[in-house]
UniProtKB/Swiss-Prot annotation:
InterPro entries: TFB5-like_sf, TFIIH_TTDA/Tfb5. Component of the general transcription and DNA repair factor IIH (TFIIH) core complex, which is involved in general and transcription-coupled nucleotide excision repair (NER) of damaged DNA and, when complexed to TFIIK, in RNA transcription by RNA polymerase II. In NER, TFIIH acts by opening DNA around the lesion to allow the excision of the damaged oligonucleotide and its replacement by a new DNA fragment. In transcription, TFIIH has an essential role in transcription initiation. Component of the 7-subunit TFIIH core complex composed of XPB/rad25, XPD/dnr-10, tcf-30/SSL1, tcf-29/TFB1, tcf-11/TFB2, tcf-14/TFB4 and rtf-1/TFB5, which is active in NER. The core complex associates with the 3-subunit CTD-kinase module TFIIK composed of div-66/cyclin H, prk-3/KIN28 and rtf-2/TFB3 to form the 10-subunit holoenzyme (holo-TFIIH) active in transcription. The keyword Transcription regulation applies. One of its GO terms (cellular component) is transcription factor TFIIH holo complex. It holds the Pfam family Tfb5. One of its GO terms (biological process) is transcription initiation at RNA polymerase II promoter. It comes from Neurospora crassa (strain ATCC 24698 / 74-OR23-1A / CBS 708.71 / DSM 1257 / FGSC 987). This is General transcription and DNA repair factor IIH subunit rtf-1. Belongs to the TFB5 family.
Amino acid sequence: MPRAIRGVLIQCEPAIKSIIVHLDSVNNDIIIEDLDEQTLVVKENMVQLLKQKLEDRLKETYRPEEPLADSD
C-alpha cells in the first residue's frame, strides 16, 4: 500500500536552496523532492525546524560591517 507524505512547496534563491540541501544531507529528513534550482518540497512537520536551522546558519555567515568610528 503506498504511503503519502504531507509536504510544503518552498521557493527560494539558489543560495538558500543549497543551504537547505546541505542541512538535509546529514539525515535526509527534510527534503521530499528537489524540483528545480529554486524549488523544493519539504516535509510539512519539518518546516519550523528548517526555519530555525536556516536562521541560525544565516546568523553564522552574515556579519554586517561595524560602523567606522569617527576619526576627527
